């Protein structure tokens, strides 16, 4: 399971022109689910994402988590993250989880986040338009 996290001052996701999820200060989480992923990996990744220190303290050091700053999380499914890009000019998607399992684990991950922080989400498998203001920019690739 892969989470590409971005520290944002705001982010939103739209489907067919309608905002389906939006946050102010917090993390945009692009989530990729791989074939071998399970609930244990999702839980570990939620713990890392919500505790990862990406926000600045009073001295300007990244010592605070999204929980520490009272931020929110916007979780968006991103099936391209597990893609194999090592050869050629076209990505291979065989490492990604089957759609039904990916959706189940995406929902599980999002639900766990919502138990910890205000959480918004995109719509699984929809054609989404994501807008954000990346604060920094600060972006990290986390895996479970």
Swiss-Prot record:
GO CC, any one term: cytoplasm
EC number(s) reported in the record: 3.1.1.96
Cleaved signal peptide residues: none
Alphabetical UniProt keywords: Cytoplasm, Hydrolase, RNA-binding, tRNA-binding
Annotated catalysed reactions: glycyl-tRNA(Ala) + H2O = tRNA(Ala) + glycine + H(+); a D-aminoacyl-tRNA + H2O = a tRNA + a D-alpha-amino acid + H(+)
Cellular localisation: Cytoplasm
GO molecular function, one term: Ser(Gly)-tRNA(Ala) hydrolase activity
Main location: cytoplasm
Domain of life the protein comes from: Bacteria
Pfam families: Tyr_Deacylase
GO terms of biological process kind: D-amino acid catabolic process; tRNA metabolic process
Motif Gly-cisPro motif, important for rejection of L-amino acids: where in chain: 136-137
The record's note on its domains: A Gly-cisPro motif from one monomer fits into the active site of the other monomer to allow specific chiral rejection of L-amino acids.
Free-text function comment from the UniProt entry: An aminoacyl-tRNA editing enzyme that deacylates mischarged D-aminoacyl-tRNAs. Also deacylates mischarged glycyl-tRNA(Ala), protecting cells against glycine mischarging by AlaRS. Acts via tRNA-based rather than protein-based catalysis; rejects L-amino acids rather than detecting D-amino acids in the active site. By recycling D-aminoacyl-tRNA to D-amino acids and free tRNA molecules, this enzyme counteracts the toxicity associated with the formation of D-aminoacyl-tRNA entities in vivo and helps enforce protein L-homochirality.
Subunit structure: Homodimer.
Assigned protein family: Belongs to the DTD family.
Name of the protein: D-aminoacyl-tRNA deacylase
Organism this protein belongs to: Vibrio cholerae serotype O1 (strain ATCC 39315 / El Tor Inaba N16961)
Biological classification of the source: Bacteria, Pseudomonadati, Pseudomonadota, Gammaproteobacteria, Vibrionales
């Amino acid at each position: 399971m892969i989470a590409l996290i971005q520290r944002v001052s705001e982010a939103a996701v739209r489907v067919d022109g309608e905002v389906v999820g939006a946050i102010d200060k917090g993390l945009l989480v692009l989530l990729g689910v791989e074939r071998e992923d399970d609930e244990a990996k999702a839980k570990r990744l939620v713990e890392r994402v919500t505790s990862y220190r990406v926000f600045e303290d009073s001295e300007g050091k990244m010592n605070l988590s999204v929980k520490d700053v009272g931020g929110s999380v916007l979780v968006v499914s991103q099936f391209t993250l597990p893609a194999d890009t090592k050869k050629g000019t076209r990505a291979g998607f065989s490492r990604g989880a089957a759609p039904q399992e990916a959706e189940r684990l995406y929902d599980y991950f999002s639900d766990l986040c919502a138990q910890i922080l205000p959480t918004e989400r995109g719509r699984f498998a929809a054609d989404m338009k994501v807008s954000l203001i990346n604060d920094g920019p600060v972006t990290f690739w986390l895996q479970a």
